[in-house]
């Protein structure tokens, strides 16, 4: 009987161990790991269930950026043959991950985006109670960003750009140029200026009082009410959700009228390809020294200007030309949608000489 009891006790022990092992296995399967959280996070963002701090859905471009950054994290794990979890995200991980990205010749800003997005994931998951790791909050665990050498087109460049004989190019080139010029005159992102239609455009009647010479009393004036019509484009920016109203210049209005106030749409990649062709045909071939950062190393690369033109050049050009015209920066940000003059200044690409010309024209102090 003693023997039987021992056997039964041992069997019960084995059964209990098996039960606990199975329970632990089930618990592990149910446990939310970092990678499971990332998959769910992306799914919720795409479905619109997880929104921005402003309570708006993430734009398609932002979703694309999030997925690209987190794809690199997945590739890194494959290269290391390891699945990283919440508690693995520390300075050792940071050093290994950034070194791996540099080895792949990623630019500093691209590396910064990967780190920034991972920090967003760590913050969200911590606030939702999935971990208590705070090692990723080390001040050295950061996504570095550097200003990129981006170009803008001067007034002279734009005149050449718009004077190109389009009969020597395809109809698509002309459409791409018109869409790009809408971007210049509105200073909006391509996601906004490449989708302008009749519903975005309105005509306002503005009344103002002006003083005119009094025909019956020499040397005196009389007040007169005058009216004028202004065409305005109203946009809710896709990236930020900000509402902006852009008065249409005569140049912009001519383009809108050409398409009966319903601009055609082209894919961004197509616009980028076509406007480079037009830039080359316009003779925008001056050499621009661009500093490129790859793998943590800076290199100065001489590049013909037309090769640097892309959809975002329109927004930079528009903001810069507004600034050089003497427009107040606070009025400019009402049009561009930037949150502050500091953010706007990152877009202004005027060189030192142009800024000096602007200042000396505006202020008598320098006479």
Label each PLM-derived region with a short phrase:
Residues 123-134, 183-223:
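Short, charged phosphate-coordinating catalytic segments
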Residues 94, 118, 122, 181, ...:
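Short, basic/aromatic-rich helical patch in the C-terminal catalytic core of site-specific tyrosine
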Residues 152, 222, 237-240, 329, ...:
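Catalytic-site neighborhood detector that most strongly recognizes the C-terminal catalytic loop/helix
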Residues 160-164, 204-281:
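Basic, alpha-helical nucleic-acid-contacting "clamp/cap" segments
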Residues 1-57, 62:
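N-terminal helical hairpins
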Residues 108, 112, 131, 135-190, ...:
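Basic, Lys/Arg- and aromatic-enriched nucleic-acid-binding interface segment
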Residues 168-169, 261-265, 276-334:
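Short, basic (Lys/Arg/His-rich) helix/loop patches that form interaction surfaces
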Residues 43-61, 70-149, 164-168, 261:
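N-terminal core-binding DNA-recognition domain of tyrosine recombinases/integrases
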